[in-house]
Amino acid sequence: MSFVIWITGPSGAGKTTLANALYKKLESMGYRVELLDGDGVRRKLYPNLGFSEEERWMHNRVVVEMARRLSRNGIITIVSVVSPYRAWREYARKEIEKFVEVYPRCPLEVRMKRDPKGLYSKALRGEIKGLTGLDGEYEEPENPEVVVDTDKNDR
């Protein structure tokens, strides 16, 4: 039994927290499981990759392929990645046989308060532009298999 859990949302929504909790739970139950964190994949495989739309699309495709291969080899794969556009997530859904989309829904004010990477602070100071979910577009999933209101519980 293998499948891919694709957790998508803007920075601070709770993707990593949710992914880590799922990973620990599934591993403790004896399942073969891997966690692909978008930031971690980027850091390890191509640390100099930028954040243009084309570069983010390439990053998304790489993560899709990694998840597809892991799942095909019997490993439950948890993906934690922004993937801001519905079309990108639909691409993942088409490429991955057993795909579960999880949306950690969280209001902007809560994400800004959490600000785990300091991105919202930088954006508000004008140091970065186009932050997904602030002044950069994030298309909320229309029909995810799971929605978690992460503002209700920070852990």
Curated annotation (Swiss-Prot):
It holds the Pfam family APS_kinase. Catalyzes the synthesis of activated sulfate. Coiled coil: none annotated. Keywords: ATP-binding, Kinase, Nucleotide-binding, Phosphoprotein, Transferase. It comes from Archaeoglobus fulgidus (strain ATCC 49558 / DSM 4304 / JCM 9628 / NBRC 100126 / VC-16). It is an enzyme of class 2 (transferase). Belongs to the APS kinase family. This is Probable adenylyl-sulfate kinase. SUPFAM superfamilies: P-loop containing nucleoside triphosphate hydrolases. Pathway: Sulfur metabolism; hydrogen sulfide biosynthesis; sulfite from sulfate: step 2/3. ATP binds at G9, P10, S11, G12, A13, G14, K15, T16. It catalyses: adenosine 5'-phosphosulfate + ATP = 3'-phosphoadenylyl sulfate + ADP + H(+). NCBIfam families: apsK, PRK05541.1. Residues 134-155 are annotated as: Disordered. The active site is at S83 (phosphoserine intermediate). GO terms for cellular component: cytoplasm. It comes from the Archaea.
